[in-house]
A protein has these predicted regions:
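Conserved divalent-metal-coordinating catalytic cores
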Residues: 1-257
């Protein structure tokens, strides 16, 4: 696994895009192996057709996140009405079988966003689209089909780590629908510049989980669904410099100071 991860990273660095590969492995009697790369195709996302996106200077108190590399889908500028955060600690502590109910609750939020024409961002621990709930959130693509941006977050103490499965049907669906993808690491830094993640900027926004049909009440402390009313969440990604910034542009007048 570590060898293939290194191969994919090396190819990504040279192509400047994630890649889809076909390969064979031949093993010798002493356990050594040789990897033969048969095909390598760059998986280029479309972006939104914005040329020359410029990352703005954003005051830290307004910043939701700032990422360096670990994204797919730029150059782009997007705005969001609804933001969903799956609490990493709460999810990790759930009994294994109950993890699958989180996917069902997210499906309900996805349906709500589609019916009400809400632009939707979701963030959760580990891998999205995994079949193994101990590795992340076991959603099918149909359950997040109205999502505009999806982020995987690390929660190292429970082994939940971002790892988009290049070549999977789930990944292909993200590419084909131009869904923006990003990975948020607890200890991430690039060339000495640390990434930023500040969910506290949403603390005073309206939570609407209980108002959404078909959600599961027992999960209301696991899923936080924020409806931005007077505020708006803006994301700008520059694929050339591999930098992404997301911030709350207008303060909600109902928020306490």
């Amino acid at each position: 696994v570590s060898t293939m991860r290194e191969v994919l990273k090396t190819l990504h660095d040279h192509y400047k895009y994630p890649v889809d590969i076909e390969f064979t492995i031949n093993f010798s009697e002493n356990g050594e192996f040789l990897i033969n790369l048969l095909q390598c195709r760059p998986l280029q996302s479309k972006g939104t057709g914005i040329a020359g996106v410029k990352i703005p200077e954003v005051p830290e108190e307004k910043m939701f996140m700032k990422l360096f590399k670990n994204t797919m889908g730029g150059p782009t500028k997007m705005e969001f009405h609804t933001v969903v955060i799956v609490d990493a600690k709460g999810y990790a502590e759930m009994p294994y079988k109950e993890n699958f109910s989180v996917a069902n609750a997210i499906h309900a939020v996805n349906t709500y966003a589609g019916q009400n024409k809400k632009s939707l961002m979701i963030l959760g621990p580990g891998r999205w689209g995994t079949n193994s709930a101990e590795l992340g959130i076991p959603v099918r693509y149909a359950q997040i089909s109205n999502v505009n941006a999806i982020f995987e977050m690390s929660f190292e103490s429970s082994g939940l780590m971002p790892e988009l499965s290049f070549g999977s049907h789930f990944f292909q669906d993200l590419v084909e629908t131009n869904t923006f993808y990003g990975a948020v690491f607890e200890k991430d830094s690039s060339e000495g510049v640390k990434s930023i993640y500040r969910p506290q900027v949403l603390e005073n926004e309206k939570e609407v989980y209980d108002e959404i049909p078909d959600t599961i009440k027992a999960l209301r402390n696991i899923l936080k669904v924020y409806e931005l009313e007077e505020s708006r969440m803006v994301l700008v990604a520059d694929s050339k410099w591999e930098e992404t910034v997301c911030w709350k542009e207008k303060e909600n007048p109902k928020s306490s100071k």
